[in-house]
């Protein structure tokens, strides 16, 4: 397997609005990020994935871009960005931008022109359709933010497609001029010095045009936003992107690929690097979803399902393509509350167990801000405390349709809502968790547990979650076995324990992760009985023929 720097790296995702506020307006900003680069250097990460900082009216927290070559006013200026980039590079940290090119803001100059007339030069930058003969919508596609994916525009008496909010019209990637605009913009950022791109919902860019056929409807009566996943020209367009925007740069690229299958992922991220370095798949993020309600449920996962999914991706991409490893991001709730145990007794120990489980696999690990502290779900309590369009719209839609009660939906959005990941970073135990000045009002509520979960405490404490992540990252930097070794699942049917073996040549390690409060005994394979402990979340762990795994214990033994 060919060695590449991005395979050996650990990526840290920053959601700028919630990371660090330098000017007291309650909103995180670029200068706040710059002020915390030493913290990230101490953690040991190699790359920052920066969620969107471009000019935006902020309908969807920056994923609605009105100018790709300017900075959102709330985040600072281009000079602030340049200073952050230069400072990160001085500290040996690369910057990966969030590339949002399935859609723009409806306030982008392209769309402002596009909607003016049917013969405007920018008309075909977007996807416009008339109503059907009976006056109904062009098709039954739905927005992932609830409701239909079509918005009527009276100026030309036509509808435009938006797979997300109605302020996020989809670009028409079948137009070669649009593609060149995107490639030119990417090259502009690469010339500025950025090190790569995380590509938002990139699997959705190619639609089945001109037909745009109806699809199977979901719970709300519309076909879901995966209607255009892995479309007819997506691989062709990404190969063109590689040739026209990425070929001259040693970049890191990861595609967020909604609806991606294992076979499709092999095409996106195959080792010949004609498209992307790796993809984000979401199958393991649906492990606790419900057939009826989709993600809007509070049900717990069955560990055996998780093992099947992650093992299929580990084995399926082995020697063919490259995995992205993650529990959290800005769209997913906090992993320690979701997959671990966020009680005072087990929060830190289970956060370390989850980290061990994912960081010992083959692939590039991603750490989301606050994950390295074991940040938890936030008790939002009332709908007014939520900020995320997806949660608010789903609440109204599903309760008004009688599909779920208000009580059920409040529980569901409290458990699965994206705002769980977006509460302010907990820096210390001062007012507003040190995210913002004491007199500021943060844009979203601070989790009240910041007095006991914060970076200041954890950086100073040797047994903290932060220090454990630091050790895991250091181990990966030092070990080809962890980075490049093959993966084999053991104890397949065990409902409590996730265990697997990594192999590279004559080197081997075994990983045990107890996902439960149960104490369990396992028999260590003979080849490991003389091995050494690489890392464990219990200080007194020992190697023996039979290992007793305490609640949420993780242990890694190298032979």
Where do the model's predicted regions map?
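Active-site and adjacent substrate-binding regions of carbohydrate-active enzymes
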Residues: 1-559
